[in-house]
Amino acid sequence: MARFVLVHGAWHGGWCFGRLAEELTAHGHEVATPDLPCEEIGLTPFDYARLVGPQPDAIVVGHSLGGLTIAQIEARVRVYLGALLPVENVYAEAFVDGFGGFTRDHDGRSYWPDADTAAAGMYPDCSRAQSDWAFAQLRRQAPLDAVTGPFGDGDVVVATLRDGAVDSGWQIRTAQAHGARVIELDAGHSPFFTQPGELADVFNSLA
């Protein structure tokens, strides 16, 4: 049995990992899904990491923007799932051309304006029922500065090959350039919604 700590990305919360957590629990693992204060202005990935706390005995998974957080967390293994990796120029280079549709409020927090836009921009490979359910729970995301390292040897990148947000080629090239292990998953940006069983099998293989 292993302990998994699943760290969400922008706009989401620990709720997004519900089905994945059930699958991992069925494998006999312990799972934590913390909620980060993504709406609070002025925080950094270091603040998020302090809220999660050191996890020296856990496999810590960061999805999407959560990759910048887990880089700062002591862990048995760090796993980057369709994630922004803590390297130079991440915001300029990581995203798929044309990704977007979110807007910003007067404080600079980004949000998805309606369910149709979220379905097209964030969840194109999800069912409409899945995307509507997720949209109803999304929060606003305060600006978050990019951070670098540590990243590389001992880390695992689960590259989501049909990702419409974080470019899969960038995920793979960046991981290889820094000596991280690459596992390719034929999935979109949110496989915890679309392929929770298959994703749990990948994580179980790391336990």
Task: Describe the predicted segments one by one.
Residues 2-41:
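Conserved HGGG/HGGXW glycine-rich cap/lid loop of the alpha/beta-hydrolase fold
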Residues 30-59, 95-96:
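Active-site loop/oxyanion-hole signature of alpha/beta-hydrolase fold enzymes
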Residues 37-39, 186-190:
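Histidine-bearing beta->alpha loop at or near hydrolase active sites
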Residues 61-66, 70:
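Gly/Ala-rich beta-loop-alpha elbow adjacent to hydrolase catalytic centers
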Residues 76-111, 115, 145, 166, ...:
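Flexible "cap/lid" loop of the alpha/beta hydrolase fold
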Residues 133-153:
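Active-site nucleophile elbow and catalytic-triad environment of alpha/beta-hydrolase enzymes
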Residues 157-159:
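Short beta-strand/loop motif that positions the catalytic acidic residue
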Residues 161-186, 193, 205-206:
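Conserved loop-alpha-helix segment in the C-terminal half of the alpha/beta-hydrolase fold
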